[in-house]
């Protein structure tokens, strides 16, 4: 639990994204082992298939909760030390590390069942027909301007959509039963840790298999994490951490963005609530029934939508004592690389987005983030009254994206993505690339007087190439003061008070979570580009180019 923290799960996909709100807005900064990590997973769109563009998964899905030692939340002026991007707060995650002692091996595993929370109750066939008749009659009276919607009396010529015989001899199909199901979760965790006075190590591995509660939903995840700390000399130590994970998802249609297509490209859950209960599952010829332009909920089970993600990150830290335990310097390098491939195929016998047509999309994405920091720290207890801690540092942060994809139409169902060159329809190729760079200088000083009165000040200067020239840099100051009331003599005798502190702070934070295409770029439109005849090029205005 954390005061002021709100979480909302906005996807029923396994590993679905959790929106975290700390300061009234979403997307806080996540700092894992001192390195800022992406909070959102890389995502791909559905191309020209009509499927949702994003399946909403967490950027930290590759971090095993069993490897986490502690979590700290910064939500006031203390977040200003992280400067631009910290307007929505900061979440500090400290992974477990090895400790001096004999090797320790631990294992835990679990198997659990998952059931859907009681869902919306849809109308049965008789209720549906009765309400359809009521609505149809009211609509008739309104259009004819008959009572009570006009001066004319009812003419008695309205005929019900469903007769009494229809209502008494109708079948009843509960479409939710074709979409919702029970699931399960299997977890296995294994850790090994230990060390000596010179070397400490931690290794952790996990396996997770989850079957979702919506048709076609599921995932398999493998994670491996390790770190090692080495004291090379009394004045020099080195730590290294690494994490690798692989995730394989089966994506389900659960009601996300439909690309402004409305119910013609709605989810299986949406269709299950909209589909009339009096319709059977299949028609006389064995094909799925269709209702207007809404996809058959059960038919969506034949849509194949798979995602595979690979991620690994490396962190290196060197700490050198320049003068006793008073003055030291630290260097940090962190790298996180993610790759993802998503493949979609809609068979020709599935009516979706107002058509019977085989369609597919293959898309790959890659993201690389790098962190490089150098810090000088000072720590000393002076005059037997004041503990002084100060830090000054510089940082450079790089982020790059690259992706490509192709949508295709009219390929044989048995071939699907295995040979898209055999497709008889149109092809829609896409590609993109982007790079961002941020540079920072930061300073922090703290004074703890008599272990009762604390004063802290920070100053950070951030610059990013996301903004126009002349507006790339900004300062982010903060100051805070605290009174540890529980350390005063008049409260020490009260045993039921462990910590009582009064704190006030002021600070300035920023936001750069604005994407990488804020102004002009080369941007061909895949609907208009024709490689054999012509193309369209948008040239940015010269004064708006990035440096």
Positions of PLM-derived features:
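Extracytoplasmic beta-strand/coil segments of soluble accessory domains associated
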Residues: 1-44, 69-70, 75, 79-96
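Aromatic/His-enriched, Gly/Pro-containing loop or helix-boundary segments
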Residues: 52-62, 222, 356-363
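Conserved, well-structured beta-alpha core segment at the onset of a catalytic domain
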Residues: 62, 67, 74-92, 216-229, ...
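Flexible glycine-rich, low-complexity coil/linker segments exposed to the extracellular/periplasmic environment
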Residues: 36, 122-123, 127-176, 268-299, ...
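Residues embedded in well-ordered regular secondary structure
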Residues: 3, 14, 18, 28, ...
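Extracellular/periplasmic, surface-exposed regions of secreted and cell-surface proteins
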Residues: 221, 227-236, 241-246, 254-255, ...
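Switch/connector loops and helix/strand junctions flanking conserved nucleotide-binding motifs
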Residues: 81-83, 101-102, 115-118, 248-251, ...
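A short, flexible beta-alpha/helix-coil linker loop
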Residues: 37, 207-211, 460-465
């Amino acid at each position: 639990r954390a005061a002021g923290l709100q979480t909302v799960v906005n996807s029923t996909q396994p590993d679905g994204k959790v929106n975290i709100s700390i300061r009234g807005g979403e997307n806080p900064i996540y700092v894992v082992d001192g390195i800022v990590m992406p909070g959102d997973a890389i995502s791909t769109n559905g191309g020209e298939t009509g499927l949702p563009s994003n399946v909403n998964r967490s950027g930290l899905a590759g971090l095993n909760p069993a490897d986490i030692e502690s979590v700290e939340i910064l939500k006031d002026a203390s977040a200003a030390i992280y400067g631009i991007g910290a307007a929505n707060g900061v979440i500090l995650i400290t992974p477990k590390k090895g400790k001096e002692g004999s090797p320790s091996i631990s294992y835990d595993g679990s198997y659990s069942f998952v059931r859907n929370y009681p869902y919306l109750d849809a109308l049965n066939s008789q209720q549906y027909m009765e309400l359809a008749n009521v609505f149809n009659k009211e609509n008739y009276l309104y259009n004819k301007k008959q009572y009570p919607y006009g001066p004319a009396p009812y003419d008695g010529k309205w005929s019900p959509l469903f007769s009494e015989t229809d209502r008494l001899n109708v079948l009843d199909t509960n479409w939710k039963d074709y979409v919702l199901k029970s699931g399960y979760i299997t977890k296995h965790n294994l850790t090994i840790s230990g060390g000596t006075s010179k070397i400490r190590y931690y290794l952790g591995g996990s396996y997770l298999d989850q079957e979702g509660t919506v048709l076609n939903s599921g995932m398999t995840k493998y994670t491996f994490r390790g770190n090692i700390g080495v004291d090379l000399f009394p004045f020099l130590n080195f730590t290294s951490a690494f994490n690798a994970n692989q995730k394989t998802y089966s994506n389900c249609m659960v009601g996300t963005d439909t690309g402004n297509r409305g119910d013609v490209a709605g989810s299986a859950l949406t269709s299950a609530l909209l589909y009339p209960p009096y319709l059977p599952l299949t028609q006389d010829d064995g094909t799925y029934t269709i209702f207007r332009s809404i996809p058959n909920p059960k038919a969506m089970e034949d849509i194949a939508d798979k995602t595979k993600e690979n991620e690994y990150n490396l962190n290196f830290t060197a700490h050198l004592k320049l003068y006793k335990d008073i003055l030291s310097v630290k260097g940090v390098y962190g790298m996180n690389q993610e790759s993802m491939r998503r493949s979609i195929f809609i068979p020709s016998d599935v009516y979706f987005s107002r058509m019977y047509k085989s369609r597919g999309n293959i898309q790959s994405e890659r993201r690389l983030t790098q962190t490089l920091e150098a810090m000088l720290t000072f720590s000393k207890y002076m005059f037997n009254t004041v503990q002084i801690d100060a830090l000054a540092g510089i940082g450079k942060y790089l982020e790059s994206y690259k992706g490509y994809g192709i949508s295709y139409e009219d390929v044989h169902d048995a071939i699907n993505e295995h040979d898209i060159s055999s497709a008889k329809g149109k092809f829609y190729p896409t590609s993109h690339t982007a790079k961002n760079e941020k540079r920072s200088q930061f300073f922090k000083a703290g004074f703890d007087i008599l272990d009762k009165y604390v004063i802290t000040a920070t100053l950070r200067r951030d610059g990013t190439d996301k903004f126009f020239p002349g507006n790339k840099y900004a300062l982010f100051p903060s100051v805070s003061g605290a009174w540890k009331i529980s350390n005063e003599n008049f409260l020490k005798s009260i045993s039921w008070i462990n910590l009582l502190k009064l704190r006030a702070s002021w600070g300035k934070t920023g936001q750069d979570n604005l994407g990488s295409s804020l102004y002009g770029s080369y941007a061909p439109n895949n609907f208009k580009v024709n490689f054999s005849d012509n193309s369209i090029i948008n040239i940015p205005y010269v004064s708006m180019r990035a440096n």
